[in-house]
Amino acid sequence: MNTFFSRLITVVACFFIFSAAWFCLWSISLHLVERPELAALLFPFGLRLGLMLQCPRGYWPVLLGAEWLLVYWLAQEVALAHLPLLMIGSVLTLLPVALTSRYRHQRDWRTLLLQGAALTAAALLQSLPWLGQGEEAWNALLLTLTGGLTLAPICLVFWHYLTSTTWLPLGPSLVSQPVNWRGRHLIWYLLLFIVSLWLQLGLPAELSRFTPFCLALPIIALAWHYGWQGALIATLMNAIALIASQTWHDHPVDLLLSLLAQSLTGLLLGAGIQRLRELNQSLQKELARNHRLAERLLETEESVRRDVARELHDDIGQTITAIRTQAGIVQRLAADNGGVKQSGQLIEQLSLGVYDAVRRLLGRLRPRQLDDLTLAQAIRSLLREMELESRGIVSHLDWRIDETALSESQRVTLFRVCQEGLNNIVKHANASAVTLQGWQQDERLMLVIEDDGSGLPPGSHQQGFGLTGMRERVSALGGTLTISCTHGTRVSVSLPQRYV
């Protein structure tokens, strides 16, 4: 029983609200076209069709019945002509609305174009019974197209707002909360409306021919900032400005054509902007997905490097130790045999060389410092191991990065960039000083390696010297690596602290 009364109250409220809005829009339309029956085909048609495209089918009889009652009442009061044509046309419009009603809850650019096509088809069907009335058939088509494309998209905007907003019941907890008026958006809308109104009313007579082109300015501005909703709201502002300047038009057809043109512009531009935004969102998701995959690949690569380094260290290290031990035994057993003793010493030296080579290889595969030290300590250890001071290179480290904010991939990447950059400086730069700086800035990790040497040879920025691998690692984490050689070489790395 409660459900029945709730439904009944909703239906009655919809009936009276729609009837009041329909009559107000009919009065405005009558001011523009000055014929009662044609006025019903302008904005009232757009209101009824716009609501039918958005609301469930159960409310269609309420809207259609309210319109028929109003049309019948107007026929008695103001001698409204062609009453059967209006009613037959309104029934015919149910066909395209019914075909597109299943897609009304979608929120993509295709919905805008689909509803635009439904509006066009409904306008054709509404004006179809007027074919026997001569020139009035074209007037009916122009009126229905203009009214439908002007008001129906606005119904879509309001319906989207009402259905996408979370509504909470009014309670004591909400009374004390301030109202968010979103003043910046309101001021932005108001300024554009004033500009649009001034362009229609305030331009000199010699510039009046440019006023139709000015209608696109608010549409473009709001579409750029707010997407398809902004484009459709801009068409409503333009429609109000055009109606306010109706006295400047020599013929109502000029006004209707202007309304129709700017409504089509708003609808198509809104669909285009929505399509562009959807593509951008899709590209951003794919880019984020690719970066996540690349980061996982880096983590997998480091895991494999760590396992290989451990196996090399355990197996080859033990083997080399055994070789050195056996070589020492041979030397002691053959102390009187100079040739054998010399061969034992050579074997021991070669095994030491192999051990050093394997040790360097292990350092390249997986820096052992990262397993035992923090990143700052690992970089200091790297500076000591490279013996820069013995090579006449003064080093300075300024590290201000919080390591708790770093992922394992970022730690390894920053260390390897430092490792490769220092190797290039030692081998090619002929530098006397090198500076490493690391800091956090605006949710980004910054690393700069700078020396006062001769710079990299020409053409080495794109290939060689480990730069390709460095760039690939940094790019895989969503960062950038730049190299400049103005005074020495400067390697700059910028990584997002957390890639989303």
From Swiss-Prot:
Ranges facing Cytoplasmic side: 274-500
Modified-residue entries (Phosphohistidine), positions: H313
Gene3D superfamilies referenced in this protein's UniProt entry, alphabetically: 1.20.5.1930, Histidine kinase-like ATPase, C-terminal domain
Naturally occurring in which organism (per UniProt): Salmonella typhimurium (strain LT2 / SGSC1412 / ATCC 700720)
Record-level GO cellular component terms: plasma membrane
Domain Histidine kinase per the UniProt entry, residue ranges: 311-499
Membrane topology according to the record: Multi-pass membrane protein
Transmembrane segments: 8-28, 78-98, 112-132, 140-160, 185-205, 207-224, 231-249, 253-273
EC code(s) of this entry: 2.7.13.3, 3.1.3.-
Encoding gene per record: uhpB
The reaction(s) this protein catalyses: ATP + protein L-histidine = ADP + protein N-phospho-L-histidine
Keywords annotated in UniProt: ATP-binding, Cell inner membrane, Cell membrane, Hydrolase, Kinase, Membrane, Nucleotide-binding, Phosphoprotein, Protein phosphatase, Transferase, Transmembrane, Transmembrane helix, Two-component regulatory system
PROSITE patterns associated with the record: HIS_KIN (PS50109)
Protein name: Signal transduction histidine-protein kinase/phosphatase UhpB
Keyword Ribosomal protein attributed: no
Alphabetized GO MF terms: ATP binding; phosphoprotein phosphatase activity; phosphorelay sensor kinase activity; protein dimerization activity
GO terms, biological process: signal transduction
Origin: domain of life: Bacteria
